[in-house]
Amino acid sequence: VVGGDECNINEHRFLVAIFNSNGFVCSGTLINQEWVLTAAHCDSTDFQIKLGAHSKKVLNEDEQIRNPKEKFICPNKKNDEVLDKDIMLIKLDSRVSNSEHIAPLSLPSSPPSVGSVCHIMGWGSITPIEVTFPDVPHCAYINLLDDAACQPGYPEVLPEYRTLCAGILEGGKDTCNYDSGGPLICNGQFQGIVSYGAHPCGQSLKPGIYTKVFDYNDWIQSIIAGNTAATCPP
């Protein structure tokens, strides 16, 4: 996250870190005791999930590590289009209990409204061009913009991709490299998943692109309920 500050250690209990043998890959969001939501483009062969983390150097006593037991990507996702249905649901290999730094964030009860203030967070780069990893997650507040605000900067993002456009039009605050998969929280509701953006991060007229969680509520709830053949909206 560029243009932000260190997150309050108690305000991201649902934020998880996804890492593999090469190191930190992505963030994700705990949505109940055994399921995490992230971006499909965060998938890799050997990743693990760390819950309850804040600082990379000073570990929280209640940090937990889980492996993915099952991973679900929309069966109707166009695989050659990385921005299409950029959402992945992960079942953990064992449940996690709520603790001081671990608690889920529920799915949105209504779609987000343009103009709402949204919270972004992650362990991604805090500088826009070269990648600078912070020791702690950084947080910032941005605005949910009309889809038309992202159209000029991102002609490749098609309307059927079910995305949200969020940022600051004049630039300066944005998610950045390695923030992928983390949450966009608007008016307290989990509305987006960090998917795509410009490089360098935080450019004017190039807000961030987020997967619209609300459109996938039915698919997510079906998978969790055991209907593993459920498909996503077109």
UniProtKB/Swiss-Prot annotation:
Indicate the principal place this protein occupies in or around the cell.
Answer: secreted
User: Per its Swiss-Prot or TrEMBL record, what regulates the activity?
Assistant: Strongly inhibited by diisopropylfluorophosphate (DFP) and to a lesser extent by PMSF, benzamidine and 4,6-diamidino-2-phenylindole. Low inhibition by hirudin.
Taxonomic superkingdom: Eukaryota
| Signal peptide extent | none
* CDD domains, alphabetized: Tryp_SPc
Q: Which SMART domains match?
A: Tryp_SPc
Q: Catalytic residues per the record?
A: H41, D86, S180
Family matches, as PANTHER family: KALLIKREIN-1 (PTHR24271:SF47), KALLIKREIN-RELATED (PTHR24271)
Q: Which family does it belong to?
A: Belongs to the peptidase S1 family. Snake venom subfamily.
**Protein name in UniProt:** Thrombin-like enzyme contortrixobin
Q: Which organism is it from?
A: Agkistrodon contortrix contortrix
Q: What is the lineage of its organism?
A: Eukaryota, Metazoa, Chordata, Craniata, Vertebrata
